[in-house]
């Protein structure tokens, strides 16, 4: 039997993203040379929300893009097992990242493998001055030496739990961060 526990509702997510937006601005001493890059899929929508908050706070329209890490993963998935053709969705970074302070944005930080793949993909696009990481939820259990610079909420979990982020933009349900527990 699976039990679901909501650890962040829509209001908590909004507050966390507002706080993270302020932290990004403060740590970078403004928005000069700042860019946001969301990791497909939910990282894209979170990056867009951070972009909106930063625009509201600073009045500056920082560039925002998205990155597909499919070909950089060490657990590559395929759209067709017969042809072994990877399911690639494409990267959209419509600005020069060279010399920029890039904030990678993702929904959940777990093992660190997704972030490693995203950094590899980003370095193939250009050479940013800095790469920071913003996540909505950090659940621990790292396999690689990676940490988030900006965290919406730390959510300690056990190995048999899964953290799921639902966003109205992509999941067509209310915004929520849910822990799924196998019992």
Curated annotation (Swiss-Prot):
Sequence motif PRPP-binding, location on chain: 102-114
The keyword RNA-binding belongs to this UniProt entry's keyword annotation: yes
GO BP terms, alphabetized: DNA-templated transcription termination
Catalytic activity, EC: 2.4.2.9
Keywords assigned: Glycosyltransferase, RNA-binding, Transcription, Transcription regulation, Transcription termination, Transferase
Domain of life: Bacteria
Catalysed reactions listed for this entry: UMP + diphosphate = 5-phospho-alpha-D-ribose 1-diphosphate + uracil
Residues noted as binding substrate in the record, renumbered to the chain: 41-42, 106-114, 139, 163
Gene3D superfamilies linked to this entry: 3.40.50.2020
Pfam families named among the record's database cross-references: Pribosyltran
Record GO terms (molecular function): RNA binding; uracil phosphoribosyltransferase activity
InterPro entries to which the protein is assigned, alphabetical: PRibTrfase_dom (IPR000836), PRTase-like (IPR029057), PyrR (IPR023050), PyrR_bifunctional (IPR050137)
Subunit structure: Homodimer and homohexamer; in equilibrium.
Family: Belongs to the purine/pyrimidine phosphoribosyltransferase family. PyrR subfamily.
Database matches in PANTHER family: BIFUNCTIONAL PROTEIN PYRR
Role: Regulates transcriptional attenuation of the pyrimidine nucleotide (pyr) operon by binding in a uridine-dependent manner to specific sites on pyr mRNA. This disrupts an antiterminator hairpin in the RNA and favors formation of a downstream transcription terminator, leading to a reduced expression of downstream genes. Also displays a weak uracil phosphoribosyltransferase activity which is not physiologically significant.
Listed name of the protein: Bifunctional protein PyrR
